A protein has these predicted regions:
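Short amphipathic alpha-helical "interface-anchor" segments enriched in bulky aromatics
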Residues: 245, 249-283
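An anionic, glycine-rich sequence signature occurring as long contiguous blocks
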Residues: 140, 144-256
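Electropositive, glycine- and tryptophan-enriched low-complexity nucleic-acid-binding patches
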Residues: 62-109
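A short, flexible helix-boundary coil/loop motif
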Residues: 162, 272-340
Length: 340
C-alpha cells in the first residue's frame, strides 16, 4: 500500500461498518458452497451464550465502566457451523434473546437444546410454533419441577426402568477419558400424566434422566505412619444426575445423542474462540467490530475443522501452516473442502 500498512484502529473502524447480519449470511452461504453437510443421525441446534471478557472495563480514573460483549450462539450440527451470532442487550439476558431468535427460524425436523437458564415456557412454545422439538434440562431455576423429577426418578424407579417398565426405556454406554472411566446411563419415560403443570409446557411428551458415573484414580497423601510411599493411589467415584424434558416421544438413542451433543457449541465453538483464536485477548470496546470479528472467526473455525482430517494437526497449527504462504495454500484448502 502506498500509504503504508493500516494501523489496527483503521481495521477496527472498517470492520465496524459492516452489517453483521449480512456478513453472517454471506459467509454461511459461501461455506455451504465449499462443503457438504455432515448428515448427522439427528439434526440439532444448540443454543448457548458466550461473553467476550476482553471487552469489559471496570471504572477507573481514566475509564468508565463498560460491560463486555455477550452473544447468543446457535450451532447447527448438520453443517458444523455456528449459523447465528446475536448480541444480547446489556439490560437483559439470554432468555428473551433466544425466544426472538427462534421466532425467526424454521425448525421442522430439528431438535433444539440449550442450558437450564433458557428452560422457560415461552422458549418452549417458540420452538413448537417454529415446527421443531426440544430436549432441554431442568435445574434449580425451575425449582419445583426439578424437585418433582428428582422424586420421580428415585433409585426404585430407575431399577424398574432398567428391568423393562413398559412406559420407559433404558440405555447405557461407557468411555475412557484420559485417566477416568465414564459411564452414562439414560432413562426416559412417557409416564408424565402425574405432573400437575403439564399444560404450561407446550408439546411436552417425555421426561428423562442422565446418570453420569465418573471413576478415576487419584494420588493422595499416605496417612500411615512411617510409610515408605508418601503418596498412594485411591479410586474415587463421582455421580452426576441431570434431568430433562422433551417434546419427543420416547426414543432412548435419540435422547442420548441430543443430551451428549448439546455440548458441541461449547467444545467446537467457545473453546476454540478462547484458546485457538485467543479472542479474550482482544481488548477493543468497539462491540460492533468485535461482533463482526467473532463472526469471521467462526467461519474460519468451520473451514479449519473441515480441513483437519487432511492436515492431521491441531487447528492452531493448521492456522500457522496456512499463514506461512496464504496465497499458495488457499486454493489447495478450498479444493479439499469441495472434494470431501
Amino acid at each position: 500500500m502506498t500509504g503504508g500498512i493500516p494501523k489496527a484502529n483503521s481495521y477496527e473502524r472498517i470492520i465496524s461498518l459492516v452489517n453483521s447480519d449480512e456478513l453472517n449470511k454471506i459467509l454461511f452461504n459461501f461455506f455451504k458452497t465449499l462443503t457438504r453437510n455432515l448428515n448427522p443421525e439427528i439434526k440439532l441446534r444448540n443454543f448457548d451464550g458466550r461473553v467476550n471478557n476482553g471487552s469489559k472495563r471496570n471504572t477507573t480514573v481514566i475509564n468508565e465502566k463498560k460491560s463486555p460483549l455477550n452473544c447468543l450462539n446457535c450451532y447447527d450440527n448438520e453443517y458444523g457451523y455456528c449459523i447465528e451470532t446475536v448480541p444480547i442487550d446489556e439490560k437483559t439476558n439470554e432468555i428473551p434473546t433466544i425466544e426472538n431468535l427462534i421466532n425467526g427460524m424454521n425448525l421442522k425436523g430439528i431438535i433444539s437444546t440449550w442450558d437450564a437458564l433458557n428452560t422457560q415456557t415461552k422458549n418452549v412454545k417458540a420452538v413448537i410454533n417454529a415446527g421443531g422439538d426440544y430436549i432441554i434440562p431442568i435445574k434449580g431455576n425451575q425449582e419445583n419441577f426439578y424437585n418433582d423429577l428428582k422424586l420421580y426418578f428415585d433409585s426404585k424407579k430407575c431399577e424398574e426402568i432398567i428391568a423393562g417398565n413398559s412406559n420407559s426405556v433404558y440405555y447405557s454406554e461407557s468411555e475412557k477419558s484420559h485417566s477416568a472411566f465414564i459411564k452414562y446411563e439414560y432413562f426416559q419415560t412417557s409416564d408424565i400424566s402425574w405432573y400437575p403443570n403439564l399444560s404450561d409446557w407446550e408439546g411436552l411428551h417425555s421426561f428423562g434422566l442422565v446418570k453420569k458415573t465418573i471413576t478415576k484414580k487419584v494420588k493422595v497423601k499416605n496417612e500411615r505412619k512411617n510409610a515408605k510411599k508418601k503418596m498412594i493411589e485411591k479410586t474415587v467415584t463421582a455421580i452426576e444426575y441431570r434431568y430433562y424434558i422433551s417434546s419427543k416421544q420416547v426414543n432412548i438413542k435419540e435422547f442420548s445423542i441430543a443430551t451428549r451433543q448439546h455440548w458441541a457449541v461449547e467444545n467446537k465453538i467457545h473453546w476454540h474462540l478462547d484458546f485457538t483464536f485467543r479472542q479474550d485477548n482482544n481488548t477493543t470496546t468497539n462491540k460492533k467490530a468485535l461482533l463482526n470479528l467473532e463472526i469471521i472467526h467462526k467461519f474460519v473455525l468451520a473451514v479449519l475443522s473441515k480441513a483437519k482430517p487432511t492436515y492431521k494437526k491441531s487447528l492452531k497449527l493448521i492456522r500457522k501452516h496456512l499463514s506461512n504462504n496464504f496465497e499458495e495454500f488457499l486454493p489447495e484448502l478450498f479444493c479439499y473442502l469441495m472434494l470431501n
